């Protein structure tokens, strides 16, 4: 990592760059709540913070001595365009931090029809770095996604009864799931508490989304992914073993037999939270060394906090509206007996 010489502190900004879905795109809750901004607001609110989407960085806001926190979500090697964005951030700012972002390498015939990025990332110029991929060939330090700090994960298994042998979490970005005949499912666009309760009420989780698998491991569940997911290597570097199902039709007995071949994850939630708290301490030390707390720019900070809160709640509001519409249509469609 880059070695920073001691310099005079200035009133700078902290920039948070993570993935926010574009207008009319299906929401991916995991990317929305993966930024560490949401979990350390007591500290970050002392400074002027600016939130950016990875596809729409406000470049004019970023200055040389500011702080940039990149992540989480699968932002590394996901595309050449994203690698260019990160390298440009590194060139523009001396204090760029990668926090819990994930790497990607695609096979030739992957279901996403994507190519592996060939633009190298200048990791050696980062101030701090931690990636969500465990024992990745790059040798980058392991740091689970910051979404593990979400308070929803404090829900106890004892408070949620088991309702099903196998639950399924589908990616809202996909029109079809790789396995047909599912008896039960939710998508990764649901509110986080809904997803947590669904995971806890299932014995085993079949899932196509990275964060759905990660959250299930946090909650101590055995995880199975469709084998089609092996087209991108981000599914190969979970902290604890997962299994891959190579059939295209749901077979509960086969899935349960497959689940029996993998160990139950230990207390991954505590481990993940501890690693994020340790990394936060490093980030806090860097910030306190480099920039002063904000006084004059408090209005900008308040506005950016409100934007962050809206990011957190809009997807939940939209999903509740859809549910209510479904219930209304169901009631209107019933004929009098």
Regions found by a protein language model. Give the residues of each.
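Active-site anion-handling motifs in enzyme catalytic cores
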Residues: 1-337
């Amino acid at each position: 990592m880059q070695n920073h010489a001691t310099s005079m502190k200035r009133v700078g900004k902290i920039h948070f760059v993570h993935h926010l879905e574009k207008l009319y795109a299906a929401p991916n809750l995991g990317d929305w709540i993966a930024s560490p901004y949401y979990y350390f607001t007591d500290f970050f609110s002392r400074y002027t913070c600016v939130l950016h989407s990875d596809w729409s960085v406000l470049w004019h806001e970023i200055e040389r001595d500011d702080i940039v926190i990149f992540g989480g979500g699968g932002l590394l090697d996901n595309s050449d365009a994203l690698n260019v964005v990160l390298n440009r951030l590194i060139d523009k700012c001396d204090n760029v931090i990668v926090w819990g972002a994930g790497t990607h390498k695609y096979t030739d015939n992957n279901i996403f029809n994507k190519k592996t990025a060939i633009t190298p990332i200048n990791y050696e110029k980062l101030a701090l770095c931690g990636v969500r991929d465990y024992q990745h060939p790059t040798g980058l330090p392991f740091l689970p996604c910051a979404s593990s700090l979400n308070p929803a994960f404090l829900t106890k298994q004892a408070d949620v009864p088991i309702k099903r042998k196998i639950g399924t979490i589908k990616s809202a970005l996909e029109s079809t799931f790789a396995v047909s005949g599912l008896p039960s499912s939710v998508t990764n666009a649901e509110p986080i508490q809904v997803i947590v309760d669904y995971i806890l009420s299932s014995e085993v989780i079949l899932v196509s989304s990275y964060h759905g698998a990660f959250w299930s491991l946090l909650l101590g569940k055995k995880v199975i992914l469709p084998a089609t997911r092996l087209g991108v290597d981000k599914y190969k570097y979970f902290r604890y073993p997962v299994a891959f199902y190579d059939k295209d039709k749901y077979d509960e007995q086969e899935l349960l037999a497959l689940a029996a071949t993998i160990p139950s994850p230990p207390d991954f939630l505590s481990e993940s939270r501890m690693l994020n708290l340790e990394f936060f301490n490093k980030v806090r030390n860097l910030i306190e060394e480099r920039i002063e707390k904000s006084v004059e720019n408090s209005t900008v900070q308040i506005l950016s906090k409100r934007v962050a809160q809206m990011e957190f709640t809009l997807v939940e509001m939209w999903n509740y509206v859809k549910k209510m519409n479904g219930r209304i249509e169901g009631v209107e469609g019933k004929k009098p007996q």
